[in-house]
Amino acid sequence: MLLLPEVRAVHDSGATCVWAMTDCRVIATVLQETGPVDQIDDQQREALHLGLGVLEREVVERITDFNDPKQEWRRLFSEFMGTFFLVLVAAGGAMMGAAFDGSIGRAAAVAAPGLMVMAMILFMGKVSGAHFNPAVSFAFALRGDFPWKRVPGYVVAQLLGAVAAAAFLQAVIGVSASQGANYPAESSTATAAFLMELVLTFGLVSVILGTASGAQNIGIIGALGVGSYIALAGLWASPISGASMNPIRTLGPDIVGNDYTAYWVYLAGPLLGAALAVVAALVLRGYGGGKDGSLAAQGDLYTDFKRPDKS
């Protein structure tokens, strides 16, 4: 990263071009202004930060506009769209099974959400971080990889996506969206379902934090680990709680179907499990996921690094 004090030192010496090493790459930043660095405008400052001074002004304008924090709507739309498709598959499998008896087996119904999450992470992970789950947003913020100020917007976008998917399914399939919600098994208890959701979400968020942390970061291929975990957890744990691991995945169909039976299980379990996963990550790796953790949590738009010094 090219720091402004370094730019000032070279600029004050009368030079018009600055070379700096960034991640073993040489970046040339041309100073167009002859006045003090403190007088450069926001766009020029952003260009210096991104090492874009050698590019044409039109290109710089497009890139800095895309990185402008005012463009938060890109992230929010990504969360809305990703959650929509997640709930479309997760709730849709059960609703299809209810409408067309025997058309979808349990294994297919619980594995499909994992595959969809994998696809959505590969598709939109670089835009928003591909949370699609308030428990994930909460965990990233708690660990310091994601700004708390963005959490409410993400949760609202996720909720709207879940409700839209549930409403679409109910209108198209013709059965109540409550058929696609999660409930404790009749042969079990709400407490057992709560404990199952807690443990399953603890594992899920641990996988997410682990694949997004410093030396453990494996980039967008972390989608394979996350999607596989969701599918495997659903295959063996769904008979007790439905293996939701996501408060919004359950709340969307609950709202449309107007049935909130034992919803506390699917709110408290995942959030507590996510918090425990952050504690486990702290024990295993220390505080924060570093630059890689921030990039994974926030996507590649304007990113605020909480711990840029952490490898």
Explain the meaning of each model-derived region:
Residues 3-47:
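RNase H catalytic domain
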Residues 34, 39-311:
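Membrane-interface helix-loop junctions and terminal tails of multi-pass membrane proteins
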